[in-house]
């Protein structure tokens, strides 16, 4: 918990909680609303894809912005912008056409593609070099709480009050997050180096070269491809799994998605304290393996029981390895990328995540009626397992350099 002693990091940590809570509210509510309105898994998949594509298209700009501009200001403006572009959802809530949701999701995703690289590139600047993994663990904690609060609130508000209630709550949460970021962070070191006259495309390509040169970043790229395909499949299949296989409600969708935060909380505390000195590759590999095996158990268990209580417990547990793997991946990228290119490297990672998540969702939406839910769910679990085995194999071979976490300049 030591990074929270830094006031700037503590404020970023709280602001990130409100931002992620708002994001989870829409991530739960909008796909469920589309599925209930259209009754089509393919249409639901399309809505998910349209919410991911902008992150891929804006990757070159997002990374350069994160490296060149004041990262705190970028985060503040993005929060305010997300609140503004969500306003058309009030029109949908009052009977407007569903296709408006697609535009809103695309705009939200475009803004989020600016938020993630800036936030994650800012974290190493606000904590001591040796506390980076602990800081990422703390970010995982508030991410888990945000998932629980936002997922539960999104499903509950949609079920009891409709989409309008979700939107009003979403706007309120984002306003709080933006306000927390409005005041500058206290600079505790020199600002990051910048090259303001370098063309955007050339700067982005420079970040791509960084990934090609560094073995740890290449390994992270393999993980991103496999796990993002799995995540895209999950986004489509989860709604079908809960509503059709478990015969649940929209509230159950939010509950089961949000309850993963319980395991995530425990894992986040572990990463922030006792596991903060564990190698990122070990967290990524063993966490991913546990995630794949637990996912396979969950997807196949309805053959024996469809008890909601059982699945609440299992989804709570599966959140833990997800946080371990996520913290390991983020720390691996942060420590492998040079400080002056970290924003571009992170934006490329997030763009790859969005792109392959979209591909996974599209393929799943098209194959669902052909292969069936059960087969695709097991493929999804298998992708996580294969990804973890690749990481553990490369790590055991000794091919990963174990460089110390670099000291980086800090800026607000």
Describe each PLM feature range.
Residues 1-412:
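Alpha-helical transmembrane-bundle signature of multi-pass membrane transport and export proteins
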């Amino acid at each position: 918990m030591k990074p929270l002693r830094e006031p700037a990091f503590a404020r970023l940590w709280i602001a990130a909680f409100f931002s992620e809570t708002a994001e989870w509210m829409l991530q739960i509510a909008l796909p469920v609303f589309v599925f209930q309105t259209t009754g089509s898994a393919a249409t639901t998949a399309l809505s998910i894809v349209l919410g991911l594509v902008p992150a891929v298209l804006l990757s070159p700009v997002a990374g350069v912005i994160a490296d060149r501009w004041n990262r705190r200001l970028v985060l503040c403006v993005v929060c305010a912008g997300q609140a503004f572009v969500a306003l058309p959802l009030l029109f949908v809530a009052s009977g407007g056409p569903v296709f408006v949701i697609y535009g809103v999701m695309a705009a939200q995703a475009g803004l989020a593609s600016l938020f993630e690289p800036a936030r994650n590139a800012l974290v190493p600047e606000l904590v001591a070099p040796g506390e980076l993994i602990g800081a990422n663990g703390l970010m995982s904690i508030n991410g888990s709480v945000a998932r629980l609060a936002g997922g539960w609130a999104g499903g509950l508000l949609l079920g009891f009050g409709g989409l309008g209630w979700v939107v009003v709550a979403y706007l309120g949460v984002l306003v709080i997050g933006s306000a927390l970021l409005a005041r500058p962070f206290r600079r505790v070191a020199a600002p990051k180096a910048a090259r303001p006259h370098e063309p955007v495309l050339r700067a982005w390509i420079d970040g791509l070269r960084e990934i090609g040169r560094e073995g740890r970043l290449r390994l992270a790229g393999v993980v991103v491809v496999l796990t993002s395909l799995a995540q895209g499949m999950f986004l489509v299949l989860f709604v079908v799994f809960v509503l059709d296989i478990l015969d649940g409600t929209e509230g159950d969708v939010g509950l089961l998605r949000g309850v993963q935060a319980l395991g995530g909380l425990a894992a986040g505390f572990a990463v922030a304290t006792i596991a903060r000195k564990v190698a990122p590759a070990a967290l990524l590999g063993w966490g991913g393996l546990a995630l794949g095996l637990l996912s396979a158990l969950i997807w196949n268990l309805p053959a024996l029981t469809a008890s909601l209580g059982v699945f609440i417990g299992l989804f709570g547990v599966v959140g833990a390895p997800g946080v371990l793997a996520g913290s390991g991946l983020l720390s691996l990228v942060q420590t492998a990328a040079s400080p002056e290119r970290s924003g571009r490297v992170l934006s490329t990672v997030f763009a790859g995540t969005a792109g392959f998540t979209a591909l996974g969702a599209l393929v799943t939406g098209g194959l669902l009626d052909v292969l069936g839910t059960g087969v695709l769910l097991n493929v999804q679990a298998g992708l996580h397992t294969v990804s973890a085995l690749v990481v553990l194999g490369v790590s055991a071979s000794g091919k990963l350099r174990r460089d110390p976490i670099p000291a980086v300049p800090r800026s607000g």
